[in-house]
């Protein structure tokens, strides 16, 4: 029963993340042209599954980047396997056998509002130029 629905949930999460990346790309937060022929660094606060990586790869698949680096403080064993398959380099401080969700590993689980995140990303992009 659990395995049956697990795949469905993962697929639905991937679809939602894919839609989110398409919307962010359309809104011009990070234009694809700015990533061409550059090193792309994907950073996550923790990776319990490969859904975020799969979604990022969907966004990046039409971009000819030079190198892909994935960095995270911790990830599950299966996710690290996926990282090795898709990235040129990985930086993962801890590989966790029984991953319990990202929030479990942080004392402060405050997530900034979406507008603050977008503003921060836009400021970073402006500094690239």
Task: Identify the meaning behind each predicted range.
Residues 1-129:
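PRPP-associated nucleotide enzymes
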């Amino acid at each position: 029963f659990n395995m049956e629905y697990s795949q469905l949930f993962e697929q639905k999460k991937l679809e939602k993340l894919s839609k989110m990346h398409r919307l962010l790309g359309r809104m011009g937060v990070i234009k694809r042209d700015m990533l061409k022929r550059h090193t792309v660094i994907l950073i996550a606060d923790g990776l319990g599954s490969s859904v975020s990586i799969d979604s990022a790869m969907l966004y990046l698949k039409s971009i000819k980047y030079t190198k892909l680096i994935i960095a995270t403080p911790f990830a599950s064993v299966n996710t690290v396997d996926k990282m090795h398959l898709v990235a040129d380099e990985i930086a993962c401080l801890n590989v966790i056998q029984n991953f319990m969700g990202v929030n479990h590993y942080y004392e402060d689980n405050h997530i900034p509002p979406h507008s603050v995140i977008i503003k921060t990303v836009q400021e970073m992009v402006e500094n690239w130029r």
